[in-house]
A protein has these predicted regions:
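N-terminal glycine-/charge-rich "phosphate-binding" loop or analogous flexible N-terminal tail
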Residues: 1-46, 175
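Short beta->alpha connector loops at strand-helix junctions that form conserved
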Residues: 32, 73-74, 90-101, 178
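An anion/phosphate-binding loop that grips the pyrophosphate of nucleotide cofactors and donors
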Residues: 46, 64, 202
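Rossmann-like adenosine-cofactor binding region
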Residues: 58-61, 179-274
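Phosphate-binding beta-alpha-beta segment of Rossmann-like dinucleotide-binding domains, i.e.
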Residues: 88, 96-150, 184
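Rossmann-like dinucleotide-binding domain for NAD(H)/NADP(H)
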Residues: 92, 230-320
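Glycine-rich Rossmann-fold phosphate-binding loop(s) that bind the pyrophosphate
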Residues: 156-157
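N-terminal Rossmann-fold NAD(P) dinucleotide-binding loop
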Residues: 160-161
Length: 320
């Protein structure tokens, strides 16, 4: 067996390394990063490939006839043509649930940064200001208490559900819009509603679903107009869920109070993005999943996925 790691940077640094994978497949070649045009030549006649953001499509698969297993070092598979992989007899394994707590934590980090104006007040104190003695260059913003607010969750997978638990701990009413309501959700203390109701009633809307043909552009100008004036939108899921131009316009007009995001349509966020100019947009560079604990989970599950496949079973295969 021969393996190729196309994006080793994902799991390097500190005490994280690829030794577990290399112990399973000694003939492993590793590349820090790989551009699209380099993917097929680097895979060559390998049986196994591990990747994160690299694409895997029909064109690449045709050039790699020996490929049998793709391990995506992530949960989402937006960059992979799963049906093409299935046609070519290539199993694809993902890593579900590795960053549930970390991403939910980032969601509330963004929300608390918005509600407490922490970054602005940090600057003020370091400049020698105190309480209401804040210069105009920094600006005094009112803080917001979360208790009693209505928190809307779109998508109720493991991250959405954990986000709802945290919201309830803050004393918020939680509304959920999800495709499937399961019996075990009955004890969660949340109310299940349709999308229109979610938009109209929530003070805070948090997105926790994959980007699919049905959810791309979910939050567009029409949806934003149906939300409460001054509501908060949070996106730690996928950038494609929102129309960023519409979000920037809604921020500029005041219809949307704040936007907190860790995911964007194009990454890195382009210099010309209108979000960069909006003071009420709180943006982080898609790092919610990179806590030390989440990365260790990612490495452990990736290695286990490979081991179980080599043993003839294969965990977390998403294209059977």
């Amino acid at each position: 067996m021969k393996a190729v790691i196309l994006e080793s940077y994902v799991m390097e640094g500190g005490d994280l390394d690829w030794s577990g994978v290399k112990a399973l497949v000694p003939d492993t070649t590793s590349y820090v990063r790989t551009a699209y045009e380099e993917i097929a030549p680097r895979i060559g006649d390998a049986d196994i490939v591990l990747l994160n953001k690299c694409r895997m499509d029909e064109e690449i698969l045709q050039q790699c006839p020996n490929l049998k297993w793709v391990g995506i070092i992530a949960t989402g598979t937006d960059n992979l043509d799963l049906e093409a992989c299935r046609r070519h007899g290539v199993a694809v394994a993902n890593v579900p649930g590795y960053s549930t707590y970390s991403v939910a934590q980032m969601t509330f980090s963004l929300l608390l940064a918005i509600c407490q104006c922490a970054e602005r007040y940090n600057r003020a104190v370091k400049q020698g200001c105190w309480q209401l003695d804040i210069p105009e260059s920094i600006g005094l913003l009112p803080q917001m208490e979360l208790y009693g607010k209505t928190y809307g969750v779109y998508g109720y997978g493991s991250i959405g559900r954990q986000s709802a638990r945290i919201a309830r701990a803050f004393g918020m009413e939680v509304l959920v819009c999800t495709r499937t309501v399961r019996p075990e959700y009955a004890a969660d203390g949340v109310e299940f509603v349709d999308y229109d109701t979610l938009l109209r009633r929530c003070d805070i809307l948090s997105l926790h679903c994959p980007a699919t043909p049905q959810t791309r552009g979910l939050v567009n100008a029409e949806a934003l107009a149906r939300m409460k004036p001054g509501a908060i939108l949070l996106n730690t899921a996928r950038g494609a869920l929102v129309d960023e131009e519409a979000v920037a316009a809604a921020l500029h007009s005041g219809q949307l109070g704040f936007y907190g995001a860790d995911a964007f349509v194009t990454e890195p966020l382009p210099q010309e993005s209108p979000l960069r100019a909006e003071p009420h947009a709180i943006l982080t560079p898609h790092i919610a999943w990179t806590t030390r604990e989440a990365l260790q989970n990612l490495m452990d599950i990736t290695t286990r996925n490979l081991r179980t496949w080599l043993e003839g079973n294969g965990e977390h295969i998403v294209n059977r």
